[in-house]
Amino acid sequence: MYHELGVASWGKLKADVVAVNRKGHIVIVEVKSCWADFHTDHKYHKYLPYCNQFYFVFTDTLWASHSDRIVLPRECGVLVLSSTTGLVEAVRPSTNRKMEPSVKKDMVLRMAWRAATYSKYQGTRRTRVFLQTQ
């Protein structure tokens, strides 16, 4: 899973969260922290060619207060983050979209470069440490 990953070689289109699920599908999640953040953001459709599934994630308080005003296309899923437990619930599943093979390859390479310990631009990079909780 990566945060703030550039999805296109042009411009500044960066997805909040990019992950690969168990089926090998690329999933992009756009995090919305408040109503204004969601209401003014009209770029979600630009992410669709770069993923198999696309989700918006809202806090439980934002979802409870504005779910009737949040209108999304059928292809977008909704995740709700609990402010008390920190768990995420899929309120609405995302449709599974097909990706162009060349785009999928490019996304996998972007994730691999991001995870690598070496960058041709920055020399040796820091090693990522993943902690397991029990």
Residue ranges and their predicted role:
Residues M1-D16, A36:
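Gly/Pro/Ser/Thr-rich low-complexity, intrinsically disordered segments predominantly at protein N-termini
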Residues L5, A19-N21, K32-S33, D60:
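Short glycine-rich, polar/acidic loop-and-turn segments at beta strand-coil junctions
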Residues A15-I28:
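Active-site beta-strand-loop-beta-strand hairpin of nuclease catalytic cores
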Residues I26, S33-S82:
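Catalytic cores of nucleic-acid endonucleases
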